[in-house]
A protein has these predicted regions:
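Polar, surface-exposed loop/tail segments
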Residues: 8, 13-17, 136-139, 178-243, ...
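C-terminal cap/loop subdomain of S1 sulfatases and analogous C-terminal strand-loop tails that border
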Residues: 151, 191, 198-299, 338, ...
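Active-site-proximal cap/lid insertion segments
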Residues: 32-191, 195-205, 257-258, 262-298, ...
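Short alpha-helical segments and helix-capping/turn motifs at coil-helix boundaries
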Residues: 21-30, 128, 151-153, 232-235
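Catalytic-site neighborhoods of secreted/periplasmic enzymes
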Residues: 1-53, 218
């Protein structure tokens, strides 16, 4: 497969050098070899939280996508041009009860919906390009967002407003078109499902399970799990378990308020308005919940009758059995995944990088075995990448993943590098028999 990413890399660690054939604003399936299978990701940042207070132009807004590699400082052509609203002033907006119903909040929500309309057009662009390339009916298209909404009390929290996301799968030739699927799905299911869709068996080390494809799991999820720890410059620890109807949350730092003063989020007009109204005593009881000085140790919500998760049932005797069930499931899950949340960050860093020195991946070792080059690395978990210097003349092409011995040829020059995620990459090792 030819694998591309355009272009966000918010991985919390440096990616492996073999992660992508290309990851840039130019990355596209159109750069692959003819008839090569492809896997392409496009991240439309227009609906990102920051676009509520600073709606800016991106490379997707250029007349040609992907742009030519000589585009230069493309953003300069948008200097001084304000983003318009793509929705009318009369748009009907339903404000959730945890936010004030006033013009400031309504204007942020209007911009949010405008950004969604704009994003929808970008999705249409990609679908049109697939159609133009006669690939639309040969390609599985998966659409989803990376977390819940961008407004206060949404992103960063484990309420459904922060973790529930839309997802659409389009199969070729209208297969299962219009079907609605209410299964519980977790993001840890994405990797095994992707492999399953490509007829590749998922690995045993995957925490998730395939929900589509050849290796689709026979067992549906009974629960999904969620975790929240560091929020930019602030730290907390919350865990959650949800079944189809009920959500359990465990707050490991109940002495901390839910609201944390994140400098980045407070650029938002709605956030500034919430702070102002809290200080002046203008918030109602539901809106004040987020500003409590302490959190309950446990929370339980019926998401059917209380979709905004505002009525905590953890202390209600009628729900003690459900509370016990989900509480035990939370503990069981944390044990199964060896949850590192309770470990202080300094100790966690020390366990990864002793003395805070980043480990270095061992250099790859090249052996000529018969008519093949066999390459290995002593660093457990490292990926090995290679470039055929005598063939790969395009400088932007990424490192190919080494997965099998390379046939020996006269006049060949091959570069190898090894990299384990979290480590520094190895030095480049070159095999050459060229004159």
């Amino acid at each position: 497969y030819y694998c591309t990413n355009n272009k966000k890399e918010d991985y919390q660690f440096y990616k492996s050098l073999t992660a992508w054939d290309e990851s840039s604003i130019f990355a596209h399936w159109r750069n692959r070899d003819k008839d090569q299978n492809f896997y392409s990701i496009f991240n439309f940042g227009v609906t990102h939280e920051s676009n509520l207070w600073d709606p800016w132009y991106r490379h997707f807004d250029l007349d040609t996508f992907p742009p030519g590699r000589g585009i230069g400082k493309w953003w300069e052509q948008f200097a001084g041009i304000e983003k318009p609203f793509y929705v009318s002033d009369s748009i009907k907006i339903s404000i959730p009860p945890y936010l004030p119903n006033n013009d400031i909040v309504r204007n942020d929500m209007k911009r949010m919906y405008s950004n969604i309309v704009e994003m929808d057009g970008k999705v249409g662009l990609i679908l049109k390009q697939l159609e133009d390339d006669n690939l639309l009916e040969e390609t599985i298209v998966v659409f989803y967002t990376d977390h819940g909404g961008p407004l206060p009390r949404e992103k960063r929290l484990l309420y459904d407003s922060g973790i529930r996301v839309p997802m659409i799968i389009r199969y070729p030739n209208q297969v299962r078109a219009g079907e609605v699927d209410n299964r519980l799905i977790s993001f840890v299911d994405f990797a095994p499902t992707l492999l399953s869709m490509a007829n590749i068996p998922p690995h045993k080390f995957h925490q998730g399970r395939a929900f589509e494809g050849k290796y689709k799991s026979k067992n549906k999820r009974k629960y999904i799990y969620a975790a929240a720890d560091r929020f930019d410059e602030h730290y907390d620890m919350i865990r959650a378990v949800r079944d189809n109807q009920y959500k359990y949350l465990k707050n490991f730092n109940p002495e901390k308020p839910y609201y944390l003063p994140l400098e980045y989020r407070e650029k938002m007009d709605s956030m500034q308005e919430l702070i102002r109204m809290n200080q002046s005593g203008q918030l109602d009881n539901l809106q004040l919940q987020w500003f409590r000085n302490e959190k309950p140790k446990e929370e339980l919500f019926d998401t059917y009758s209380d979709p905004y998760e505002l009525r905590n049932l953890a202390g209600d005797p009628k729900y003690k059995d459900k509370l016990y069930e989900l509480k035990n499931e939370c503990s069981k899950w944390m044990d199964e995944v060896d949850d590192k949340g309770p470990m202080p960050e300094e100790e966690l860093i020390e366990s990864f990088w002793p003395n805070k020195i980043q480990p270095i991946t061992k250099d790859p070792v090249i052996d000529k075995v018969g008519d093949n080059l066999v390459v290995s690395c002593q660093t457990e978990g490292a990926n090995i990448g290679f470039k055929l210097s005598h063939q790969d003349t395009l400088t932007w092409k990424g490192w190919r993943p080494y997965i099998k011995p390379i046939a020996y040829e006269e006049g060949m020059k091959v570069e190898f590098k090894a990299h384990r995620i979290g480590y520094l990459p190895s030095k480049k090792v070159v095999f050459s028999n060229a004159n």
